[in-house]
UniProtKB/Swiss-Prot annotation:
This is Coiled-coil-helix-coiled-coil-helix domain-containing protein 7. Monomer. A motif (Cx9C motif 2) lies at residues 37-47. PANTHER family: COILED-COIL-HELIX-COILED-COIL-HELIX DOMAIN-CONTAINING PROTEIN 7. Disulfide bonds join C16-C47, C26-C37.
Length: 85
C-alpha cells in the first residue's frame, strides 16, 4: 500500500474515514450513479468542513497536533451530544 493511501486509511489522520467508506460503498452498490449517493457525499463534505474548522482553530491556538487524534475526536463529539454533520 502506498504511503499516501496508508495515511488516508489511518483513523488518526482521516477524521471522515467512515463517511468516505460509506460514499464509496454507495457508489459500488448503485453502479456509480452519483445522484443516488448525493446524501453520502454531502455528509462527507460536511464532515471534512467541520474537522477542518476544528483543525484551523487548534492551529491558531497553538495546539499540537492540529488534527485531534481519533480518541480526542470521540470526546469532542460526545461533548457536543450529537453529530454536527
Amino acid at each position: 500500500m502506498p504511503v499516501v493511501t496508508g495515511r488516508l486509511r489511518d483513523p488518526d489522520i482521516n477524521p471522515c474515514l467512515s463517511e468516505s467508506d460509506a460514499s464509496t460503498r454507495c457508489l459500488d452498490e448503485n453502479n456509480y450513479d452519483k445522484e443516488r449517493c448525493s446524501t453520502y457525499f454531502l455528509k462527507y463534505k460536511n464532515c471534512r468542513k467541520f474537522w477542518h474548522s476544528i483543525m484551523m482553530q487548534r492551529r491558531r491556538n497553538g495546539v499540537k497536533p492540529c488534527m485531534p487524534t481519533a480518541a480526542e475526536r470521540d470526546e469532542i463529539l460526545r461533548a457536543m451530544g450529537k453529530m454536527p454533520y
